[in-house]
Amino acid sequence: MDKILIDSDVILDALLDRKPFSVHATQILSMCETGEINGYLTPVIYSNLYYLLRRIAKHEKVIEKLKQLIKITKVLTMDQQVVENALHSGFLDFEDALQNYAAINRSNIDLILTRNLKDYKNSELGIFTPETYIKSRKSKR
């Protein structure tokens, strides 16, 4: 079973029904819910989601969405090593560097799902959009 870090843009696509991306993003969350894949988020992703969703919804509603999300995903830890690796990386976006090294620090993460492929070009992990990941799973069957 694949262990996948899901970037915040993918989660937002699903939660905000951002077409056309929401189709595949919703499939990814469904796969997490059914146990087909293990989806992981970081505390930074939860913080970003709260901040962005709070702009359009009340605190209680946002917290409820995040509670639903945490039921179907797991949280990667971030520690000093993750921050130091991110600080010394070649990533131009520090937040993406944090996500990347949180996934690498947890050695069994297989890949990162994001729509911002260019932001992760320096990653050692496989980087996929939700669409290409779903297509690659279908071709393996």
Give the residues covered by each predicted segment.
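A conserved hydrophobic position in a structured secondary element of the catalytic/binding core
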Residues: 6-7, 41, 78, 115
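A generic structural signal for short hydrophobic patches within well-formed alpha-helices
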Residues: 11-12, 46, 83, 120, ...
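Active-site-proximal, substrate-binding regions of enzyme catalytic domains
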Residues: 19, 26, 44-82
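Short, flexible helix/strand-to-coil boundary loops that buttress conserved ligand/catalytic motifs
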Residues: 15, 87-90, 124
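Short, well-structured N-terminal submotif of metal-dependent ribonuclease cores
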Residues: 1-40, 54-61, 134-141
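Acidic, PIN/NYN-like endoribonuclease modules and their adjacent C-terminal/linker elements
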Residues: 3, 104-141
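Active-site neighborhoods of divalent-metal-dependent phosphate/nucleic-acid chemistry enzymes
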Residues: 71-117
